[in-house]
C-alpha cells in the first residue's frame, strides 16, 4: 500500500489544493515537504480558522475561510462537538473541541455510529464553487486533498473544470450514509469522471490519478 504522505513527498508539486484543512496540521506537513509550492487551503469552520490563524498557518498558505460546494454565496454548516481527549493524537486535538466531523450535510447515521460526537450548533458560512475561485482560474493543480465529511459530491459538482486540470486527487469517502445524501465511492467515481483511475483504496480514503492531465 502506498503511504499517502510519502507519495506526496516524492511528487514535484507547484500547486497544492487542500479542501477541508481543519487545524492546518496536514497543511504544515505539506509545507515541510514542499517548501516552494503554492498551497491553497479552504476551511469553513470559524473555530478551525481561528486556530489556524493563531498558529500562523495562514502565513505559509493561501487560506480561504469558506466552504466549497456546488453554489456561490452562503450555506448552512453543521458544527460537530465532543470530547476529543480519547482520540487525540496531538496537542491541538487535546486542547480543542471535536470539530473534525463538521459538514455541509446534516448528520444522520453518524449520530448513531459515533454517539460521543454531537452537532449542537450550526453556522451560515461563505461558500463558492471551486471552478469560480478567481485565484485558481486556469491553474494546473498537481495535487488536490479533500476532507469534507460527506459533502464530497458538492465539492466535485462545483469543480468539474478544475478536476480536468488536476493530476492527483485524494479524497475521503464512506460507503455508509453518515450524512444526509452522502454518496458512496462508486457514486463519487461516477461523478468525478472516467479520466481518474484508482491508484490506491485505503478503505475510507482513495488516491486517484487523472490519466489525461
What are these regions (language model features)?
Residues 1-213:
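Phosphate/nucleotide-binding beta-alpha loop and adjacent structural elements of enzyme active sites
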Amino acid at each position: 500500500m502506498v503511504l499517502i504522505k510519502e507519495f506526496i513527498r516524492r511528487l514535484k508539486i507547484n500547486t497544492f489544493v487542500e479542501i477541508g484543512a481543519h487545524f492546518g496540521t496536514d497543511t504544515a506537513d505539506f509545507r515541510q515537504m514542499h517548501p516552494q509550492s503554492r498551497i491553497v487551503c479552504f476551511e469553513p469552520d470559524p473555530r478551525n480558522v481561528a486556530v489556524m490563524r493563531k498558529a500562523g498557518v495562514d502565513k505559509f498558505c493561501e487560506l480561504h475561510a469558506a466552504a466549497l460546494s456546488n453554489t456561490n454565496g452562503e450555506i448552512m454548516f453543521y458544527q460537530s462537538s465532543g470530547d476529543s481527549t480519547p482520540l487525540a493524537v496531538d496537542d491541538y486535538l487535546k486542547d480543542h473541541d471535536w470539530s473534525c466531523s463538521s459538514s455541509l450535510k446534516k448528520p444522520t447515521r453518524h449520530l448513531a455510529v459515533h454517539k460521543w460526537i454531537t452537532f449542537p450548533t450550526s453556522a451560515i458560512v461563505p461558500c463558492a464553487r471551486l471552478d469560480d475561485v478567481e485565484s485558481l482560474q486556469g491553474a494546473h493543480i498537481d495535487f488536490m486533498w479533500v476532507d469534507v465529511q460527506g459533502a464530497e459530491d458538492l465539492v466535485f459538482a462545483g469543480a468539474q473544470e478544475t478536476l480536468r486540470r488536476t493530476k492527483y486527487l485524494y479524497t475521503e469517502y464512506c460507503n455508509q450514509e453518515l450524512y444526509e445524501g452522502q454518496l458512496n465511492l462508486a457514486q463519487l467515481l461516477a461523478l468525478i469522471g472516467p479520466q481518474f483511475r484508482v491508484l490506491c483504496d485505503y478503505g475510507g480514503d482513495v488516491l486517484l490519478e487523472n490519466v489525461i492531465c
